[in-house]
Amino acid sequence: MPSIKLGTMTISVSKNMLLAKLQQLSRMIPSKSTTPIVCNYLFEIKDGRLFITTANDEGRITASLECMAEEDLSICVPASILDGLKTLPEQPLDIYINPDNKSILIKYYGGKFEVVGYDSKPFPQKKKTEILDEIRTTAEEFNNGISKVINFAAADELRPIMNSVSIETALGEIIFVSSNGHGLG
């Protein structure tokens, strides 16, 4: 389990564990944005967990890793950290975060690399949503609905709205729809 110490915060974690979470979340990071802070990962340490969040104009995704922490911390980490981690073999990493100057030092066996983080305050906050309708379903039923229409979703960077599945509720049912512009699923 990763550990975090006082002073300059230290996160010890498996390279593959961290890389897997960052790669999952990287799909949400825009290549260009009018809000540059969303081109970063948000690292938050709360209640013994490291939460990693990405956001764009359409939403946000959060993943978490267990850790031991003596205090909470929040910092934005450049997406370029992913490129540095990809080149390393599996090994324990020690990530040192200086909350004062936002410097981030990643040490590994035989080397280190540094990046400069950013204050987390400008990162988009989670929006509070009003629950208008509630339908209960199992994860298996939900996954089944998505798997039936996902093949109809496009993978087109020029029309990102076609790269998704629309989920609507009507009369107590969940309706899953996707389209690539040629077929409807």
For every predicted segment, state its role.
Residues 1-185:
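Structural preference for solvent-exposed beta-strand-turn elements
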